[in-house]
């Protein structure tokens, strides 16, 4: 598996299995003397139709609250792993797309993401892991997560 990786990106989802993904990424980073970065993408949801204009501010407030909560969680996790603040990203968008975009922008050569075993290829990998695997321009390690 080791291929002299220089920059590893953890795609964190804060699930109960995030520790497994982070642990695997940290092991690989230590083995390869690689820089470690981490990101969390808050899944964007469409704003309410303009016919329901009063709901738009609620949607924006909810998105802002989710982003703020994500930033706090990511900072705590990244700090515990010794990941520099300039190597942490929390954004709102499409997880599969934005993980790949961040990896490209930061010249990452390995993305580490969790995968859930559920059903079909999407169920085997999970929709985010599936999107990352199929669109990344670098290696992807899908860490198999045990279902509780």
Segments from the language model and where they lie:
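Short, hinge-like loop/turn segments at secondary-structure boundaries
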Residues: 53-57, 105-106, 129-130
